[in-house]
Amino acid sequence: MTIVLGRVPKEENDLFDTMDDWLRRDRFVFVGWSGLLLFPCAYFALGGWFTGTTFVTSWYTHGLASSYLEGCNFLTAAVSTPANSLAHSLLLLWGPEAQGDFTRWCQLGGLWTFVALHGAFALIGFMLRQFELARSVQLRPYNAISFSGPIAVFVSVFLIYPLGQSGWFFAPSFGVAAIFRFILFFQGFHNWTLNPFHMMGVAGVLGAALLCAIHGATVENTLFEDGDGANTFRAFNPTQAEETYSMVTANRFWSQIFGVAFSNKRWLHFFMLFVPVTGLWMSAIGVVGLALNLRAYDFVSQEIRAAEDPEFETFYTKNILLNEGIRAWMAAQDQPHENLIFPEEVLPRGNAL
């Protein structure tokens, strides 16, 4: 019998393996394949927003001052949407509108589409980052799935809604006061607060806040006593087998308070995940409906009776009148190019609506 000893030739890593090794290397800030999408898009979205709020006016698109350079502050500065006449143009810097002129591109509202599209892809990249890291450390992907809620809301409000309307003009501008104005617009033109999907969204978000507060307080209240006084951060070993807090005590407490309580940690934490994510998704679905101009609840019988009987009025009919006032003032202000003229008798008159 002959035994031959020799070296097995080592195959050289191809480009993919080399990139995979570098991208997924254990470092202080994980990069990963998702980072190729996340980091550039987040950088450009934030950079575009800071640039716009610092230097760029909205005079040419909305007739407004919207930058620190013009005297706005953090609450009133914004990167505003393009003009209504530009419809759904992507407003590329090299496109037919700006023709490579950066100043003209900013004046036309090009920074808004730049921030919106890069922001959407940055959020998707962050979700993929959570998937990638979860797979690397062998976790379930619920963090990434939960983050689909904020992504759905962003995409529906900033992209799908204006796509259903006549242009990007009707999307929210990126600023605090600008978002508030958009909320008022949603109420006046869509009666958003009476939309069942908005109601489910509010229930989900506020319900999640309540659950979070209750859960945090309950865990704090039932932490097992340790030998380090009030400081529990050094007393428990991360690899300990026993519980850090008493689920049995917590269950007994809430059973006495409400009559019912969670007896299973998995169901409890899944419920805390389910409530806010479902609320955000319901809100997103509702905004998609508004993009198609679907109406909220209409209680026509109350409106007819209120019109016929001056002594009959409900909170609903009062809100409908307020919505009419919002529309009458907002439409003429926001869309001067439409030359909307309302007779004096239909315009709100101060407090005398």
Swiss-Prot record:
The keyword Ribosomal protein does not apply. Its EC number is 1.10.3.9. Pheophytin a binds at residues 130, 143. Keywords: Acetylation, Chlorophyll, Chloroplast, Chromophore, Electron transport, Iron, Magnesium, Membrane, Metal-binding, Oxidoreductase, Phosphoprotein, Photosynthesis, Photosystem II, Plastid, Thylakoid, Transmembrane, Transmembrane helix, Transport. It is an enzyme of class 1 (oxidoreductase). GO terms for molecular function: chlorophyll binding; electron transporter, transferring electrons within the cyclic electron transport pathway of photosynthesis activity; iron ion binding; oxygen evolving activity. A plastoquinone binds at residues 215, 262. The chain crosses the membrane at residues 41-61, 125-141, 153-166, 208-228, 279-295. PANTHER family: PHOTOSYSTEM II D2 PROTEIN (PTHR33149:SF12), PHOTOSYSTEM II PROTEIN D1 (PTHR33149). NCBIfam families: psbD. 2 of the reaction center chlorophylls (ChlD1 and ChlD2) are entirely coordinated by water. PSII is composed of 1 copy each of membrane proteins PsbA, PsbB, PsbC, PsbD, PsbE, PsbF, PsbH, PsbI, PsbJ, PsbK, PsbL, PsbM, PsbT, PsbX, PsbY, PsbZ, Psb30/Ycf12, at least 3 peripheral proteins of the oxygen-evolving complex and a large number of cofactors. It forms dimeric complexes. Belongs to the reaction center PufL/M/PsbA/D family. This is Photosystem II D2 protein.
